[in-house]
Amino acid sequence: MPCTSTTDINIHYQRKGTGCPVLFLGGVGGDLRSQPNVFASPLAENFDILTFGQRGTGLTDKPDMACTMAQYAQDAAAVMDAVNWDSAHVVGVSFGGMVAQELALGFPQRVRSLVLCCTAAGGAGGSSYPIHELSSLSPAERSRKMLAIGDDRFNEAWQAENAEETERMLKAAAANASPFLSEPGGITGITRQLEARSHHNTFDRLPAIRIPALVCGGEYDRQARPEVVRNLHAQIADAELCFFAG
């Protein structure tokens, strides 16, 4: 996997496909070694996809130091430099959507268009669910909580009434968990991401974004709640809004 260096870390990245350049920014703990990833999606069949392990994840360095969303955006710009991209269409999912906002604000000339999926603006627009507050729960309690946060149709009441199906879903989630979190710095990297996520706030600055934008959300998502997604959308002039039944 190719690597590029910034002033303080080495970043591993991957690029595949042909067509218009698309920078993909994934969620907390994203690891390019985990399968399936973005390259298994239809995107890779139609675009030149570039993505990378954000600091603290995957094969990228994992410094135990506080980091802001703006710094994560600087890392993204550095990866674009590594492949000689002046600009690209940017797709950000969840945490990656927050990084994408900072990239569009801090490096406007480098973002051709913006797709923000299940993410939030923070501040007066509302924030995504504070996942960092779940660290005190047992693994079993946290898994049940995350099931409900991910889709409100599987809330606590539903779980109580559907114990067998709940256990099946929890086992499936455990089977899909990253096998790389036990590596040195794995948990620390995610902790630092969640810290940055908890301070994310672009709400008042978003009107400065003047490029084509699409904001997407899930109707039953409790992590990036529909009202939070709508608030984000309302701050970007002429942005499109789309909700999925999930």
Describe these PLM feature segments.
Residues 5-65:
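Conserved HGGG/HGGXW glycine-rich cap/lid loop of the alpha/beta-hydrolase fold
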Residues 89, 112-115, 207:
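Residue in the alpha/beta-hydrolase core beta-strand immediately N-terminal to the catalytic nucleophile
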Residues 92, 96, 100:
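Gly/Ala-rich beta-loop-alpha elbow adjacent to hydrolase catalytic centers
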Residues 101, 105, 112-144:
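Flexible "cap/lid" loop of the alpha/beta hydrolase fold
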Residues 146-198, 204-205:
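Conserved alpha/beta-hydrolase catalytic His-Asp/Glu region
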Residues 222-228:
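Conserved alpha/beta-hydrolase "acid-adjacent" motif
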